[in-house]
Design a protein with these regions (language model features):
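Extracellular/periplasmic periplasmic-binding protein-like sensory domains
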Residues: 256-332, 405-408
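Hydrophobic alpha-helical segments within soluble ligand-binding/sensing domains
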Residues: 98, 159-183, 224-226, 249, ...
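Segments of small-molecule ligand-sensing domains
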Residues: 318-330, 339-398
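Signal peptide-proximal N-terminal region
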Residues: 41-46, 64-86, 206-209
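Extracytoplasmic ligand/sensor domains, especially the bilobed periplasmic-binding protein
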Residues: 110-215, 265-291
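C-terminal motif of bacterial Sec signal peptides marking the signal peptidase cleavage site
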Residues: 18-21
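Extracytoplasmic "Venus flytrap"
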Residues: 32-40, 44-67, 89-96, 118-119, ...
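Beta-alpha junction/loop-to-helix N-cap segments that form part of ligand/metal-binding clefts
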Residues: 26-34, 58-64, 76-149, 160, ...
Length: 410
């Protein structure tokens, strides 16, 4: 499994090199007199870039969850007396706009660090520039495996969520146990995100009797995936792996039902939202879906009396009332922000390098993550903060966790 990961990481690195080239710049983002910009005795300025508009605008609620958590920390006095100012800009899920935002945040806003910038292609477009400026690009909102593997060339970049190769391994392990001769049809987004998960899955099933028998890709600019779904449904697949973002995830669920395609349907974590995907598609059409989870589902009655989820919902209501408390993306943002605060608390001095040292050496529990899942890093070579997930199945009106937490190896 480890050799398969190494091979795929080499391919992924080659893929993103072209994206990264457009983000290169020689401007120096360092402050004067040896001090780092964006941090004072009473404030810390962070920057982020998100798709507030465009085909992935459903992810806007990630920023809302993060803002709510930072506001709740500020209300209690901040981090060591420093209030957090989180400046978030819209990139419409377009890499060139992400590049513009990164330059603005670093050169004009003078942020201390970039936090949770969203999207595989967008982060790939800016990471050469950001690392050249020696500005932390931490806890990016993308599960591309590259963020945790290329620490030598990009020491200021880290992921947060379980990477897509880990997720693909979990699906492969599930099928190997539950459907060991599965014939799989795959719908995937035609970019680094989709290819990372798809190729990770192909590597993970090597040596098994599981076979990928059909593949169809879509562009983020496509209006629908109807034609792709028709082609996949005409294959001899008995399993459907749906690698998509929320808009297209919902479309695929509807299309499968319309086509009468009754196969095991696995939908990737980023499109598994009951609120944003399953409800628009129809809960009746979503029965039996398989996915993964690593944080608590705010819509599940399982966590109705959970202290961490109560704190989350109260904080969201107080500081981001426009956000939906049952949106899992809000929990994602809240949890990532909680991790960021722990990293800031762990700094031995108020510098960017001290932040990275803290980020690379963590062992902490974030209360909104699932029991048994922690944020752990163990040195400068460790770029995978969360390395565990749990299989879940949609039954009735909610996701139901299955089995035990599955931990990956890197």
């Amino acid at each position: 499994m480890r050799n398969a990961r190494i091979v795929w990481l080499a391919l992924l690195a080659a893929f993103v090199m072209g994206l990264a080239a457009c983000g290169r710049d020689d401007d120096d983002g360092a402050g004067e007199g040896g001090s780092d910009p964006g941090i004072t005795k009473d404030s810390i300025k962070l920057g982020g870039s998100y798709p507030f508009s465009g085909p992935a605008s459903a992810y806007r609620s990630i920023e809302q969850g993060a803002q709510a958590y930072f506001a709740s920390v500020n209300a209690e006095g901040g981090v060591d007396g420093r209030k957090i100012d989180f400046v978030a800009l819209d990139d419409a899920y377009e890499p060139p706009k992400a590049v513009q935002n990164a330059r603005r945040l670093i050169q004009e806003e003078k942020v201390f660090a970039l936090f949770n910038t969203l999207g595989t292609a967008n982060n790939a477009a800016i990471w050469d520039y950001v690392n050249k400026q020696k500005v932390p690009q931490v806890y990016v909102a993308t599960g591309a495996s590259l963020w945790g593997a290329d620490v030598d060339a990009h020491p200021y970049t880290t992921g947060w969520q379980p990477d897509y190769v880990t997720e693909s391994q979990v699906y492969a392990d599930y099928l190997d146990k539950e459907k060991p001769q599965a014939k799989v049809a795959v719908l995937y987004q035609n970019d680094a995100f989709g290819e990372d998960l798809l190729n990770g899955f192909k590597k993970a099933i090597e040596g098994t009797d599981i076979e990928v028998v059909a593949e169809e890709s879509y562009e983020v600019t496509d209006p629908t995936v109807s034609s792709q779904m028709s082609k996949l449904a005409s294959s001899d697949a008995d399993t459907f792996l749906n690698i998509s973002t929320p808009k297209f995830g919902a479309q695929a669920i509807v299309a499968a039902d319309k086509l009468g395609w009754k196969v095991l349907h696995i939908i990737n974590n980023v499109a598994a939202s009951k609120l944003l995907v399953l409800q628009p598609a129809g809960l009746d059409k979503s029965q039996g879906l398989i996915s993964t989870a690593y944080f608590k589902d705010p819509a599940s009655p399982e966590w109705a009396n959970d202290d961490a989820m109560t704190e989350f919902k109260d904080g969201l209501k107080r500081f981001e009332p426009r956000a939906n408390p049952e949106d899992p993306n809000c929990v994602f943002g809240w949890s990532a922000a909680a991790t960021m605060v722990e990293a800031l608390k762990g700094m031995k001095e108020p510098t960017r390098d001290a932040l990275m040292d803290s980020v690379r050496n963590m062992d902490t529990e974030i209360p909104t993550l699932l029991p048994g899942i922690k944020v752990t890093t163990s040195g400068s070579e460790d770029g995978y903060p969360i390395e565990a997930m749990q299989i879940q199945r949609f039954e009735g009106e909610n996701w139901k966790l299955l089995g035990d937490v599955i931990k990956a190896e890197h």
